[in-house]
C-alpha cells in the first residue's frame, strides 16, 4: 500500500535540525504543492535560487532514511521550472517513498499553515522547540497535529462483496462504503451508521482488517469487514454532495482488481478475492 515504502525507513519523530541545501522543501498553497517541472519535489537550494530563505524560515518535518523534508511559509514565486500543482500528484509519484514522504510533509505543512494564529485568543502562534507542537505565547494553549479517523467497510454477503461508486471528484473506480467517524462514536458505531446511511443495510460481525494513513485528508483509515444482516437489497443514499452513484453486489468470480494495490480499499477487495480468512469468517 501507499505507506509501505520498505526498504526505506520513515522517521516522524521531531527534531530541531536546520535545513541543508539538498534537503527537500515543501511549499504548500492550499491543496497545491510546489513542484519541479511537475516531476520532483524541490530542494532548499532550488528554492533559494529564486527567493531568499533563511535557515530559521524552514521547519523540519520528517525524514526517510537520510532524505530530510522541511517546509516554509515563505511565498515562493512560480518560475519556468517551479510551479504549483495538486498535491494528489504525489499519490502516483515515482519513486513511491518520495510520494509518501511528500504527502505526509504536505499534511504537516498544511497543519502549520492552519494554525498561524491561536484559535482561542487570536495571537500569532509559535513553533515549539521541544516537540511537534504549536504554542500560543499569550494564553499558553498547545496545538498538536490532528488526525481525522475514517472507516472503510467491505460488506460481504456470502460469496458477494458490495462495491460502490461515488459522484465526487474525478475518481471513477469502484470503491467501498466509507466515511468520517463522528464525534462520540466508536469505530464500530461509525461502521453501522455509514452502512445504513449510504446503502440502507444492517451489518453484523464487524471485524477489523487493517489501517492506512491518508495524508491527503489528514486521515487514519480503519478498514473493516462486516456481514450483511438480513435483507441484502441496496437502498442508495441520493442526498447531498457525497451521494452514491452506484452500489452493486459482485461475486468473487466476477470481481476484477482495478487498482495497483496502493489503497486500503483495493487491498481489502483483493483480500476478499483471494479468500483471506478475515473476509470469509466472522
Ligand atoms: Zn492563545
Indicate where each model-derived feature is located.
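Cys/His-rich short segments
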Residues: 103-154
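Short, well-ordered strand-loop elements centered on a beta-strand within folded domains, enriched
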Residues: 32-36, 67-73, 160-165, 176, ...
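Short, charged surface segments at domain edges that flank catalytic/cofactor-binding sites
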Residues: 92-103, 107
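Unchanged
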Residues: 53-92, 181-282
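Residue-level detector of short, conserved catalytic/binding motifs and their immediate flanks
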Residues: 22-24, 151, 222
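N-terminal alpha-helical interaction blocks
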Residues: 1-96, 277-282
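A generic structural signal for well-ordered coil/turn residues at beta-strand boundaries
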Residues: 114, 149, 157-158, 170, ...
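N-terminal strand-loop-strand
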Residues: 28-29, 133-176, 180, 202-203, ...
